[in-house]
Amino acid sequence: MNMKKGVSQLTLQTLSLVAGFMAWSIISPLMPFISQDVDISPGQISVILAIPVILGSVLRVPFGYLTNIVGAKWVFFWSFIVLLLPIFLLGQAQSPGMLMLSGFFLGIGGAIFSVGVTSVPKYFSKDKVGLANGIYGVGNIGTAVSSFCAPVLAGAIGWQNTVRSYLIILSIFAILMFFLGDKNEPKVKIPLMAQVKDLSKNYKLYYLSLWYFITFGAFVAFGIFLPNFLVDHFSIDKVDAGIRSGIFIALATFLRPVGGVIGDKFNAVQALIIDFVIMIIGALILSLSSHIVLFTIGCLAISICAGIGNGLIFKLVPSYFSKEAGSANGIVSMMGGLGGFFPPLVITFVTSITGSSHLAFFFLAIFGVIALITMIHLNKKEKAIRI
């Protein structure tokens, strides 16, 4: 394996993921500004914030498969080119419908996650895959970049011009990928239906999908709803809410490689069991508290566990599915993305019915317990095989 090429492609793809996630998440931190100019109901806000997750999740399966066919270079390149259109439309949006339309196609920025997790392991030995995928996952920091920077820029130049500035960023990365992407990336051309048939018989795929539905889903969902939630429920300043949301995202992002390293050195399933116990405790804190201090503690616990859990899970995916890595990565990451779609809608619905969001966070704890049971089951089966 060419380590020099591996490092260069890992760097390029990680930075490309940053750009993609910046575009994918641009609406959420700007929503407090957008809602001042566009007449939007609370229900419409929830839908608009959740919509980018749909395409960002569903496209992860074909993107992972295409990466094995044509290589990461071309999937990244054309994704950035296509993303220019919804960014342009968002900068012109004057109605909820236009916000929804542009947000839907911004999902492409989230779908490119499966490109790197399929491509990067090809350049590294098995004992380095967890770390490499963890480093690539740091590209999730693009969400935090938007959370930190977009509100500040919007306050200075307006939210429309802030959105338009992303056209420059995406154009730069399209050019970089065109000239620096690896055109000789190893290809894997196993027929898609053959991969799906084999994967559908493996219960581990369903377990990993459930776990990632929770960990990455929490990462995405909290990043989506926190800015508006903090403003509405705790009367926090819009810029301060963006910074707090950015801290949540940054913490989870930078801990992702830590999860990968833990998975490389120790039993990843056992580490996930510990991780989920702490996450369940964090969810229970959120479900039982209304004070900003306790809410912050619960959010930090969720952030830490989501980040480490994401890294651990994507250590396991290439280990369990080496021949079907592209499709498996796509399916698992798709489920993670979908995990971020439902919580904002559930929180809005529960709050409208009960007057409080507590029950919604309790649902997260319940899902965590279900996942914990499956982890214990898998750990017992693997122990029996080792014996």
From Swiss-Prot:
Keywords: Cell membrane, Membrane, Nitrate assimilation, Transmembrane, Transmembrane helix, Transport. GO terms for molecular function: nitrate transmembrane transporter activity. It comes from Staphylococcus epidermidis (strain ATCC 12228 / FDA PCI 1200). This is Probable nitrate transporter NarT. Probably required for nitrate uptake under anoxic conditions. Also possibly involved in excretion of nitrite produced by the dissimilatory reduction of nitrate. Pfam families: MFS_1. Belongs to the major facilitator superfamily. Nitrate/nitrite porter (TC 2.A.1.8) family. The chain crosses the membrane at residues 14-34, 45-65, 69-89, 97-117, 137-157, 161-181, 211-231, 246-266, 268-288, 294-314, 330-350, 358-378. It is a multi-pass membrane protein. One of its GO terms (cellular component) is plasma membrane. Its main location: membrane. Induction: Positively regulated by the two-component system NreB/NreC. The keyword Acetylation does not apply.
